[in-house]
Every structure is written in structure tokens, then in C-alpha cells.
């Protein structure tokens, strides 16, 4: 539910203030892990306030013109950050392929719990998930076939729709299972509450029972997160920009303003902190996006899904969602930089 709300407004705002056409604003695995780490023992009000404060901090960075600091970040650092993020995303999605459920607080915790719950794996999820990955990767390469003219364009559209095709086929399979009354051999997604979120101010204090928590008390609890998460989100957006800039310039200061507007506005619909999503950005790049206007299509689809499609989310197998994410994010790993770095300095 929070994920849908977080993805809803960012696209509309980034379309206006953003500069990187590949960036897809919304919730990410990286932001979710960081937010969970800082607020896991706190009420949900802290998450919304954290979103607002992240926006304020990003706005201050933009007003102070701190975008030049991003230029000091070397290519290997950006590449390492992107690769590490891709690794975290893939690792967090392995449980979906295995068909197991657990919550992981960190990379080490996820690995430990994968080993701990490995005996609970479900063959249905594994077979369907791996088949989906193979299918998606094969369809991804269709556009490289040596054909010309209209056939090439048709094949390009088929290749482009690979994720949607896999999703619809899997939903149809789930529907057939449910219609026949046969138990599902794999786990499916949960339904979400339909309807749009209500507009309300971020919680600058709250009352729980006989206890009143003031704004200074709330800010003290998230004091570290207010600085760490905005910095990571800026680095994420800039990393995406550099990954697709092909040597071009990156307007880091403007990206700070765009992130600030997305998070401040998002806090009014109870969003979590957001930034550019590596996975969705990879999907957008593969789709041949030309401008930031692509965000409006994604946001409109999320809006329609929130209003009308939430009752059907239970038809989507979890392993299919994991397959789509893994198939997209593995191409963010920068293999080419390893060889020159190895030749430059082996110590």
C-alpha cells in the first residue's frame, strides 16, 4: 500500500523538475532497506516525517548549490555503488524465486535467512521463476535478429512487451488454477486497499494513548536518517544519470531540487522516502525512452491500478515479480570497468 502511494506522485513531479529521462521516481529496495533500518522499532508516523525531512534536507542542498560535490565522486565509486545496489536488489528477490517468506534487515541477515529457510523452498516458484527469467532474457535479444523493415519493428515491439507478456501469462495461469479449485503451486501477491490516499499534513507530533510525542522528540529519533537517506538518494539519482549519460554532464543541483519536491509532496500522501529506481530505470532505458515525460505514463498507470486493479493483484505470482526485477537489474552491473581498474592498480 505504501509502495503504491510512494510511486504515485513522484512521477508527476519529476516530469517537471527532473533532468534524467531514464529516472523513474518511486520506492526502491535501497530506500526501503534504509528506511526500515532507521524506523523498524518506531510507529509509522516517523516514516512519513522522515520523508518530509528528507525533502527539506535535499532542498537545502539544492539551495546551497552543493551539486558540485557530486563531480568529486569518481566513476569507479559510482560504478561500485550501482553494482552494489544491483547486488542488493537481486539478493532481496531470491526469496521470491525460492517461494519463501521472511524479512531481512541487512545483506548479511538476508543471506543468513536464505540459508535458514532454504528447506522451505517451493518447486513451483522455482520452476516458474527461472522459466520467466529465461523467457524474458530471450525476448530481450529478439531485437538483435538480422531482419529489416516492418518485421524488425514488430519484433522490437514484441521484445519491448516482454515483462507485460510474462505478467499477463502468469496471471492467466493463476486464474485457471483458482477457477478449477486446484491449489496453487506457488505464492501469489496480496491484495491492496483500493482508492486514492487522502491528503494530510505530515505528523509533526502525535498522541498514543496517554503519551504525547512532540516534533523535537520525533526528530531526535530519526536524526541520523535525516542526513544519510537524502545523501544516498542523491547518489542513487546521479548514479543512474551517469550510467546513461555516455559522457554527458549531470545537473546534480537540479536533481536535488527534484528529489526534494518529490519527497515533500509525497509526505502529504503518507509516502516513504523515494529516489530514482535502478530497476525501473533499466526497464525505461530498455524501452527506448526519450524524455522525462515517460514518468507521466507510469504515474497514470499506477493511478489507474490504485483505483481499479488492486483486487486483482492476488493473481500475480511473487516469483514473476522477482523474475522481472532480476532480469532488469543484472544489466546494471558494470563488468567492463573491472579490467581497466585491475590493470591500473592491483594492490
Feature-to-residue mapping (PLM):
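Transmembrane helical cores of multi-pass ion-transport proteins
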Residues: 1-347
